A protein has these predicted regions:
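P-loop NTPase signaling cores
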Residues: 1-292
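Extended amphipathic alpha-helical scaffold segments
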Residues: 2-13, 129, 352-356, 366-382, ...
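Aromatic-residue hotspot detector
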Residues: 66, 78, 385, 390, ...
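Extended hydrophobic
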Residues: 175, 183-186, 197-203, 211-212, ...
């Protein structure tokens, strides 16, 4: 898809600043309809581009603004910042029980007094204010396609003829479907996409993560920034050496939020202790950029298991099981290799065929839970790789495993990949293994993914 017009969050907010702030009281506090009343000081404002292929107007003309975001790019924090800055409430479809015809109207009157709810909807329709709807993709999962369209019809009935009435956020697939449907209903839609951070914003992101729990002294700050820049420069140099197209991929990789979180963990002040010593160690060992990339991959995968899937899915499934079973499940489920394989099967459009834990009851609940979690995996952008680095890492990691080898070759036979990236990663991951002639033949394609 072609992306045009880069703008920052402040520019987007300024285009909606004439909207009247929400002035009513909710009947009860809830997670499905709320107003953000605080600002996250560690939040770094993203930039956006307009996806021209699925937009039918510019931002100024839009009756609906759709914001597309892949998993782990800070969509939830963006929603909070929009709500806080504009003083406009959020309907979170991830928390609602029902999504369908009139469900939006019903939700509003469930949480507001009748006269106030009616007045607020009238103000939306007259263009005086607007509403934020988050987790459009999760709403789609709770219904069928017709139910989703019925929900969008409910939205359409409340739209101003001349002004923006709704800002809706969600994953790529649901946003694209909503855009096509609303366009078919004659509604003016502008679709935005969250862009990777620029180098300066990447540095700001890392700084805020590293310093959020521990302020650095002036002396430590100088050494910290030198170490931070060394890591970012090492990663950037790896891509620059391979040509302009790969340099652009490198900028996208370095500016991707999950990558920056991994770098922040690597530079965590409580773990590092002495930045000057770390900096000298990195320089002295001439640490290769490929080693840094592998460290980042490990941290991203470890983080997805430790902070997301274990507490939010696995622990709930095993809570009534024996101590020994819990130990096995926590060890064997959602390993780094399994995560890579599950992403590969999603890219192939196939179901994952293996059981990481040999227990039918666990497997049923685990598979069901991952239907929700896997689309948000940081290696994915919809049903495509989030970045060429993730794509090649998955293939290089799995191709030496007989369990997944056929799936890797099926992917290679139908997809163009970055050969140089694949071979660099393969060599580093499989130091004791020679490269098969079949791998060389299969991967000799021109550069593939954007």
């Amino acid at each position: 898809m072609m992306n045009d017009v880069i703008m920052d969050l402040s520019t987007l907010i300024s285009k909606l600043k004439d909207k009247s702030p929400f002035k009513y009281n909710f009947k009860v506090n809830s997670e499905e309809f709320w107003l953000s009343e605080s600002s996250n000081e560690t939040y770094v404002e993203p930039d956006f581009s307009i996806i021209s292929e699925i937009s039918n107007c510019n931002l100024e003309e839009a009756q609906v603004i759709l914001i597309s975001a892949v998993g782990a790019t800070g969509k939830s924090e963006l929603t909070k910042r929009l709500s806080y800055s504009l003083k406009i409430p959020v309907v979170d479809l991830g928390q609602t029980k029902v999504v369908g015809g009139n469900s939006l109207t019903g939700l509003i009157f469930q949480h507001l007094k009748p006269l106030e709810g009616g007045q607020w909807l009238e103000d939306i329709q007259n263009g005086k204010t607007c509403m934020i709807i988050d987790a459009l993709d999760e709403g789609y999962q709770k219904t069928n396609t017709q139910g989703f369209f019925d929900f969008l019809d409910d939205v359409g009935e409340k739209i101003s003829k001349d002004d923006c009435s709704f800002i809706m956020l969600g994953r790529t697939n649901a946003i694209e479907l909503a855009s096509l449907y609303l366009d078919g209903q004659g509604i003016k839609v502008a679709v935005l996409q969250i862009e990777p951070f620029s180098l300066e914003k990447a540095k700001e992101f890392i700084d805020k993560q590293v310093c959020k729990t521990n302020t650095l002294s002036a002396q430590h700050e100088v050494s910290y920034k030198a170490t931070r820049d060394y890591v970012l420069d090492s990663l950037g140099d790896f891509f620059k050496a391979k040509g302009k197209q790969d340099e652009e991929q490198g900028n996208k990789f370095i500016g991707y939020a999950p990558v920056l979180l991994a770098i922040s963990e690597f530079l965590n002040s409580q773990k590092v202790g002495n930045y000057k010593m770390l900096f000298e160690k990195l320089k002295k060992s001439k640490v290769k950029s490929i080693s840094l990339i592998l460290d980042i991959m490990h941290r991203i995968l470890e983080r997805d298991k430790t902070y997301k899937v274990v507490p939010n899915l696995i622990m709930g499934i095993v809570k009534n099981r024996s101590t020994e079973f819990k130990k096995v499940a926590l060890r064997d489920a959602y390993t780094e290799e399994e995560q890579c394989a599950r992403v590969l099967y999603i890219l192939l459009g196939e179901d994952y065929p293996f059981k990481p834990v040999d227990d039918e009851a666990f497997d049923i609940e685990y598979r069901k839970g991952l239907v929700t979690w896997m689309p948000d995996h940081p290696f994915l952008k919809g049903r495509k790789p989030a970045n060429v680095v993730f794509e090649c890492y998955i293939l290089a990691k799995l191709i030496g495993n007989n369990k997944y080898k056929d799936a890797v070759y099926r992917y290679l036979n139908k997809t163009q990949i970055s050969s140089f990236m694949f071979f660099y990663l393969f060599k580093e991951l499989n130091k004791k293994q020679n490269i098969d002639a079949e791998i060389i033949v299969t991967t000799q394609h021109p550069y593939g993914h954007e």
